[in-house]
Amino acid sequence: MNVVKIAAHWFAVLLFGLAGAAHAQGNLEINTPAIAALQQSMQQRHSQLGPLYASGAVGLAADGTVALRDASSVPLAQRGQANALIAAENADRAALYREIARANGHPEWESDVRKTFAQRWIDRAQAGWWVQAPGGWKKK
């Protein structure tokens, strides 16, 4: 299995493997056209982020975002593209958290949805990926 296929598999586990998770009486599995579009956008981008996760350049941050953890591991000519991917991913993640809270009828839950997803992303990260833990970054 190549890195892109492995990354796509893990993205599906991370994004869609949230079955049974709930926030209070909320539904993290709720589906709206906006949520579906965000998930599709994130899944398509993940094939490009996968090698960055695998190399350790990008890690899963404790706040539910992705972060450029080690810029020196990305060739200078590719850093702009890496930063653009990270920015797009983080914009979609923020929109996803907001939309899930809104779709549950509780926009005030956005920060709780973010915290729940942040922990799930980290818990389900592939071995070898970097995750932010209390005290700093660690390799899973």
Question: For the regions a protein language model found, what residue spans apply to each?
Answer:
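Sec/Tat signal peptide C-region and signal peptidase I cleavage site
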Residues: G20-A24
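Terminal, compositionally biased segments
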Residues: A12-V13, K140
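Anionic, Ser/Thr-rich low-complexity intrinsically disordered regions
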Residues: Q25-K140
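Bacterial N-terminal signal peptides that target proteins for export
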Residues: N2-F11
